[in-house]
């Protein structure tokens, strides 16, 4: 497989897999989230569990266009919606957890719950952002912007291995520059 160096190549790669990822979206009732959902549906790369207030979610035009790829789970309370989305991902009902219009700290509370959350014991929470700059020849990866303000050496090692796993295993990037 050729190295993936742009979002267009990443999208083409995901389309070739011929498998839609299932994404659990917490409180998907805002324009930015709706836009992201619509784009993923148009590209044929995802299906969605939209967890939130069904009175709002059922008004989405996207729902009418792609009813077979969207399921709404009615939960009005955002904290409860976050807990339900985390449960669904933890139990394998979705591949990816996506944040809609919910406070980040509320979502993190559900993710980090020691008994019912997503973080395995002894592991760290980190993130990896991928950016495409049109005038640059490849994708750029940024790890852990402010998630762990003062990481220990062991935490840094785990962050680096996570970045390597995503960028080289899943995106087959040709060289490692960390």
Label the predicted regions:
Residues 135-168:
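Short, glycine-/small-residue-rich phosphate/pyrophosphate-handling segment
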Residues 169-175:
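Conserved small/polar residues in nucleotide/adenosyl-binding loops
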Residues 74-140:
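N-terminal glycine-rich phosphate/adenylate-binding segment common to multiple enzyme folds
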Residues 31-43:
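Histidine-anchored nucleotide/phosphate-binding helix
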Residues 47-54:
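Short internal beta-strands
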Residues 22, 46-47:
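Residues at the starts of beta-strands that form the adenosine-phosphate
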């Amino acid at each position: 497989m050729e190295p993936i160096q742009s979002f267009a190549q990443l999208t083409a790669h995901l389309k070739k897999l011929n498998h839609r990822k299932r994404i659990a979206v917490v409180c998907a009732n805002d324009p930015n989230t709706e836009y992201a959902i619509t784009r993923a549906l148009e590209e044929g790369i995802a299906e969605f569990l939209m967890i939130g207030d069904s009175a709002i979610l059922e008004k989405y035009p996207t729902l009418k266009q792609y009813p077979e790829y969207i399921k709404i789970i009615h939960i009005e309370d955002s904290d409860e919606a976050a807990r339900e989305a985390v449960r669904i991902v933890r139990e394998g009902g979705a591949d990816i957890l996506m944040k809609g219009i919910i406070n980040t700290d509320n979502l993190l509370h559900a993710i980090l719950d020691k008994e019912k959350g997503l973080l395995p014991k002894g592991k760290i929470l980190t993130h990896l952002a991928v950016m495409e700059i049109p005038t640059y020849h490849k994708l750029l990866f940024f790890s852990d912007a402010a998630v762990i303000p003062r990481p220990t050496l062991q935490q840094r090692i785990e962050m680096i291995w996570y970045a390597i796993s995503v960028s080289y295993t899943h995106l087959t990037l040709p060289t490692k520059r960390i």
